[in-house]
Amino acid sequence: MSDPKVTTQRNPSIVILDFGSQYSELIARRIRETEVYSMVLGYNSSVEELKKLSPQGIILSGGPSSVYEEKAPLCDPSIWDLDIPILGVCYGMQVMVKQLGGLVGEAIGKAEYGKALLQVDDPTALLTNVENGSTMWMSHGDSVKQLPAGFVRLAHTTNTPDAAIACHDRRFYGVQFHPEVVHSTDGMVIIRNFVHNICRSKPDWTTNTFIDEAINDVQEKVGKKRVLLALSGGVDSSTLAFLLKKAIGNQLTCMFIDQGFMRKGEPEFLMEFFDKKFHINVEYINARDRFLDKLQGVSDPEKKRKIIGTEFIRVFEEESLRLGPFDYLAQGTLYPDVIESSGTNIDPKTGERIAVKIKSHHNVGGLPKDLQFKLVEPLRTLFKDEVRKVGRSLGLPEEIVNRHPFPGPGLAIRILGEVTKEKLNCLRDADLIVREEIADAGLYHQIWQAFAVLLPVRSVGVMGDQRTYAWPIVLRCVSSEDGMTADWSRLPNSLLEKISNRIVNEVNGVNRVVLDITSKPPGTIEWE
């Protein structure tokens, strides 16, 4: 296999081999929380590839397959001769058992999903300082029937006799549960034991270390040449702008394309902040009318997205040629995009890797190849929470660092149906009220996203003894850790009342406010 290369010059201390688990990225994030650099690779990475990285330890992730099936994904058998510690998690533990001569079968009547109490039989090595009876998160329908030679039991649960195992001599360990998830109360204790105590990895993956290494990488790659960055004002592109400014100074040009779908006051704030306050060269492109003209009569959300994306590319191409020439295009690619582009998802029926389409932000994905840019992507080794830490260390204000996620097409996909100037003005005013009141209540940083949605229907109302026929506004507030799943936020009734009263009294064209109480799944956070 060939996984995308990262820009950092360092090798990972810990490599996670991904067997298709939904938690593989989370394992890497948890390891990095202990200040140790980790990397996710495909399960079928060769021993030769691993040797080039010289990891101090390997973790085998969970996965949807069963190891006893004909085409079950397994790792390179030579991995067991590398003489480094290996930890198998859930399916990864079963891979370890099978490849080393043990037996795994279906856990008939003994499957475990959800929380289980871990009874510690051997409180040493991997389970040092793990509390007996602590809660661990289970998610398995198979179980170990016979341990390989040299292995011993470390812990059990009511339904799982071998919940944790070890071959101490070879430093091989396995857990049938998921220590990386928040539901496993002593999960981080186990991860630290493996990473720090067993693998002896040094805690040298810090924000300042990354910044220093990234600046050196950019300077070596770019030299004295010019770099163009499409600036959106989100935390990724803002952090990247600050990092590049520190690395190459005036060789950086940022292009801010105002497509007319940003929140109230944001274009002015961004220009004041980046261009005037921090003296980062930002070229402001006012393309509001151009984008709005393209969306006339368009109601389908996917068509709106495609039109906005296509038009962005055209504007970007025209303006880059006008402002250029540029040698490099800077992109805010993050590590989850790198992982996804490597296609490590596994088909449980065939055991084969599933090709996954790379997620592309609408404002950079699909840029014309004849622009002939070379890419510079210094954030591609980072997770989102790490980007925020870097941004904060570089001097980004909290209002950008902790900004709620905002979709690339902006308010255009928070207006259901056709987008018009009147609707945009209405939604901007309503959205500002939502954000102001939630911030005043001290709840902004406790909520993942809070915003308003304008519906393409009108409802009857009464205001000042007069009949009204106006748009309803939907209030959407959700709580989440990563946006993959979300629950609707239980805001105080007094706050909901205040938001509703302000919107119907201060926003022209609105006479009703409704609350979206749908979780994700089954709904999505955005309405379009």
Curated annotation (Swiss-Prot):
This entry's Enzyme Commission designation comes to 6.3.5.2
Q: Which GO terms describe its molecular function?
A: ATP binding; GMP synthase activity
The UniProt record gives the binding positions of ATP as S232, G233, G234, V235, D236, S237, S238
Q: Is Nucleotide-binding there in the keyword field?
A: yes
Q: What is this protein called?
A: GMP synthase [glutamine-hydrolyzing]
Give the EC class as a word: ligase
Cite a GO CC annotation: cytosol
SUPFAM superfamilies linked: Adenine nucleotide alpha hydrolases-like, Class I glutamine amidotransferase-like, GMP synthetase C-terminal dimerisation domain
Enumerate the spans annotated as GMPS ATP-PPase domain: 205-403
**Which PANTHER family does this chain map to?**
GMP SYNTHASE [GLUTAMINE-HYDROLYZING] (PTHR11922:SF2), GMP SYNTHASE-RELATED (PTHR11922)
What this protein catalyses is: XMP + L-glutamine + ATP + H2O = GMP + L-glutamate + AMP + diphosphate + 2 H(+)
Q: How does it assemble?
A: Homodimer.
Every copy of the Glutamine amidotransferase type-1 domain together lies at: 13-204
**Pathway given in the UniProt record:** Purine metabolism; GMP biosynthesis; GMP from XMP (L-Gln route): step 1/1
Q: Which gene encodes it?
A: guaA
What keywords would UniProt list here? ATP-binding, Glutamine amidotransferase, GMP biosynthesis, Ligase, Nucleotide-binding, Purine biosynthesis
**Catalytic residues identified in the record:** C90, H178, E180
The function of this protein is:
Catalyzes the synthesis of GMP from XMP.
Q: Which InterPro entries match?
A: Class_I_gatase-like, GATASE, GMP_synth_C, GMP_synth_GATase, GMP_synthase, GMPS_ATP_PPase_dom, NAD/GMP_synthase, Rossmann-like_a/b/a_fold
